[in-house]
């Protein structure tokens, strides 16, 4: 209750927290420029680096994703399930664990992907597959 003659201080405007990619998120990122047979244009990208790193450095470390069917036989591609909507509806998405990359996500205009957060089991499998190649820790 407010006493007579007193007014409530206006509440501070809510600050909108800027979006920053986080570990285990799928984002859209522009892979251009590219060289040779590298993936080009805008593609989904699985984020491996933690939010605090991404925010402070403007870099994001992760793995590109594709719906190219020939990856079904690729031992370093992990199936991430089927696309629920959009022009790729019903197509299987693959995380390409043999192609780790880093990008400046701010400069490249990264955006959240409709997939959102990759399921824990799929994320763990992608990390394990990558570690078979780079053999971190141990």
Features from the language model and the residues they span:
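Conserved functional hotspots at enzyme active or ligand-binding sites that engage polyanionic ligands
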Residues: 1-138
């Amino acid at each position: 209750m407010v006493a007579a003659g007193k007014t409530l201080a206006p509440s501070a405007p809510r600050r909108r927290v800027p979006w920053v990619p986080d570990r285990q998120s799928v984002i859209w990122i522009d892979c251009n420029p590219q060289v040779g047979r590298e993936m080009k244009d805008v593609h989904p990208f699985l984020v491996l680096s933690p939010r605090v790193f991404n925010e402070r450095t403007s870099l994001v470390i992760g793995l590109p994703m594709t719906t190219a069917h020939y990856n079904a036989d690729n031992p370093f591609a992990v199936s991430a399930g089927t696309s629920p909507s959009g022009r790729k509806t019903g197509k299987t998405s693959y995380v390409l664990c043999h192609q780790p990359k880093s990008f400046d996500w701010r400069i490249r205009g990264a955006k959240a992907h409709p997939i959102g957060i990759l399921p824990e089991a799929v994320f763990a499998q992608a990390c394990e597959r990558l570690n078979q190649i780079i053999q971190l820790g141990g």
